[in-house]
Amino acid sequence: KMTISAPANQFCYHCGLEVPQQGDFSLVIQGIRRAMCCPGCAAVAATIFENGLQSFYKFRSAPSSQIVENSYSEAQGNPYADWDLEEIQSEYVSHTDQGQLSIRLYIGNITCAACTWLIEQHVGKLPGIDRIAINGTTRRGEIIWTPETLSLSQILRAIKQIGYDASPINQH
């Protein structure tokens, strides 16, 4: 039985941790095989490149945090679905005069300006996002969106998809 293993002392292209000897989670990115330490980092790196956001790697000042794999599967449905319930949103979401919704979030794992840029670019491309502003220093952000086009759960899921954890901040 043949086992694929990473060469010794190779480091993850996404998070910078040492790549384990067992398992091969590498990706070919722009014609170069890049080592990844886990399927989570490989998935996030693939998402970043698939969405044309590879400048993130050029401008970041430190490796990204290691990705903790999602504890849910697509078959289990949307893990953020409860955030779409009015009784839960009422504590966290405010309404604008134009009929949009606004939420403030705490976003963990931000380590540099490139993280902020990545989140703003990735989420900002979603249909229905009217405004997104992230402060990398405080790790807080505000998002304004059109609820008929996009749900809060879709926004939270998009943030998680690129490796960040977003926690809504109570508005009251």
Feature map (PLM): residue ranges:
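Flexible metal-binding regulatory segments at protein termini and peripheral loops
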Residues: K1-H172
